[in-house]
Amino acid sequence: MLLRLVSNSWPQVILPPRPPKVLGLQAPRRARKRAEGTASSNVFSMFDQSQIQEFKESLALSPRLERNGMISAHCNLCLTGSSNSPASASQAFTIMDQNRDGFIDKEDLRDTFAALGRINVKNEELEAMVKEAPGPINFTVFLTMFGEKLKGTDPEETILHAFKVFDTEGKGFVKADVIKEKLMTQADRFSEEEVKQMFAAFPPDVCGNLDYRNLCYVITHGEEKD
């Protein structure tokens, strides 16, 4: 239901050019599926496979995800002139986060429904949607929930390809300095502060290398590899 709300509300909701608060994206160590509950999810059960695939492709190809760290970086590194679909994780989160406090809560959902013309949404329905998350719905939790639902249609190779361009030796790592230079000089340029936030979320190792394979796994699965 969250994704349906996003796709329906996009023409009616004007996003600010830059959100006032940027969250630090901390990848969950072992964000596990809510096994029995996922299939009948109030949040996701309304979407068919084609809608899910469209979301995944837009997540992989979006030219810029405004809100968070390395997810933004991945999208900025993808090919210029790619999909302009609004159904990206960050854009979706921004739409749902009506009060711009960095979290999606019951009142945010109520306001989003109201923007779509549905005024009298029952508290029980809103509470059921919120309770599907393991905790407060910040961007990390939001991304994890989508990652859990979207397993099976992961465009992981598409995402990896954007990074492999810079991995000339095929080691699975790219130099953080190279990524920083590209992000600050090409396409929708990052500021110095945005780059710092990105590396705070997914820091390079002591040699300055960034493990982009694990990053891509987090993007598409919502959790880190063992």
Curated annotation (Swiss-Prot):
GO cellular component, one term: cytoplasm
UniProt-annotated binding residues for Ca(2+): D97, N99, D101, D108
Domain EF-hand: 84-119, 154-189, 190-225
Pfam families: EF-hand_6
Record key words, sorted: Calcium, Metal-binding, Repeat
Gene3D superfamilies, alphabetized: EF-hand
GO molecular function: calcium ion binding
Keyword Nucleus: no
Extra information: This chain binds calcium.
Subunit structure, as described in the record: Myosin is a hexamer of 2 heavy chains and 4 light chains.
PANTHER family: MYOSIN REGULATORY LIGHT CHAIN 2 (PTHR23049)
Protein name: Myosin regulatory light chain 10
Organism for this UniProt entry: Homo sapiens
Encoding gene (name): MYL10
